[in-house]
Amino acid sequence: MMENIMKKRLLSTSISTLLLGLSVMPAFADEDVTAWRLFIADHDKPVVNVIDALDGDKLATFNVKGPANLSRSESGATIFAIQGSAGVVSTIASGIAFHDHGDHADIDIDAPKLLPLELTGKKPGHFVERQGKIAQWFDGEDSAQILGESAVLKGQKNITKVNVVAPHHGVAVPYDNYAVVSIPNPDDASKRPVGARVVDLQGKKVGDDALCPGLHGSAGSGDTFALSCETGLLLITQKNAAPVIRHLPYAKTLPEGSTSTLIGGKGMQYFIGNYGPDRIILVDPTESDSFRLIQLPTRRVHFVVDPVRAKFAYVFTEDGKLNQIDVLKGEISQSVRVTDPYSMDGHWNDPRPRIAVADNKIYVTDPLKSKIIVLDATSFKKTSEISVEGQPFNIVAVGGSGKVHGEHHDHEAHHHDDHAH
């Protein structure tokens, strides 16, 4: 009888071991996976939270050295936390990476992590990344720092410093072996720059300077990068080696004013910018009638473009409404109230909502209520809220869909300890 009991135990153990082995074997069949993450910086604290955008779970909290503005790379593989008060730019690996294979893209999903590489200097300011090259500006330095995203991910501090004549509040745009840099005001470098020039990576000027009085604001869309001036936009393209700059003057039909904040369209080539406190301007650099003004119901707080639904952009206004902009029609297509009013009176850097778009959702931070409002991008209706400790302020989204080939998918990158799917 004891022999029969032992046989049953051995049989049971063997079956359990077999099932366990099957459960941990990698799935070698291709799998379509979608992953989106939100990176949120607190307004007052040196903290960056990472949240799974699809279910609201917190994935990580990173302690940095000061309150941060957040910028992401084009690839989404890296996030840059620019801490002006601390004189440092921290680098974060988003944990989501894509590999282009022509007819499809593979996706790798890992845990987000704070990288060891930091960029340091006096008063870090504007961040620009294009085609895998990063240019970080420092208002208190006479050089901009340029490096590759791949070096950041490897922890390699392979930085090229490009001279910008004098410390000033400007910008650098990286172009392979060149950069476009702002020109400081020769009479008073504390005032806005007066133009832009092309330099090689040794700081030597290439070609003629481009006048751009009151330069402030920059963005890329398609193959064109734009800089805002009091007189119009500087449009930068690169056809062969060195980039070329041309000036697009404001239309004479526009009222007096200029844009000082620009965002570039995704999927369509256009730019959207501020034009006074309660108007925005749409710029199509390919059309003869390049500029269209849109009147807002109240003063603008923040605006973004929709990278998924290319014809839309979103503007949050101080009355607590999110306004959907139809870029093709040049008008507000619909509006929805999402928060209490956030007046633009007071300090320019008071805690006010910021917007990000991830997949089919729109996310609006509500810093005074310690939460993020989630809206469905199709119905344009509020669907849920995500609680975030402190004052969630600056926000960027990273993610997308791709194929996973079995063992390359890190299922441990997102823990669900308190619930099951």
Curated annotation (Swiss-Prot):
Cysteine-cysteine disulfides: C212-C229
Residue ranges, compositional bias (Basic and acidic residues): 404-421
Motif (N-terminal Zn(2+)-binding motif): 408-419
Region spans: Disordered: 399-421
Role summary: Acts as a zinc chaperone in the AztABCD zinc transport system. Directly transfers one zinc cation to the solute binding protein AztC; the transfer occurs without the formation of a stable interaction. Binds 3 Zn(2+), two with high affinity and one with low affinity, and transfers only Zn(2+) bound to site 2 to AztC.
Assembly and oligomerization: Monomer.
Name of the protein this chain belongs to: Zinc chaperone AztD
Organism of provenance: Citrobacter koseri (strain ATCC BAA-895 / CDC 4225-83 / SGSC4696)
UniProt lineage: Bacteria, Pseudomonadati, Pseudomonadota, Gammaproteobacteria, Enterobacterales
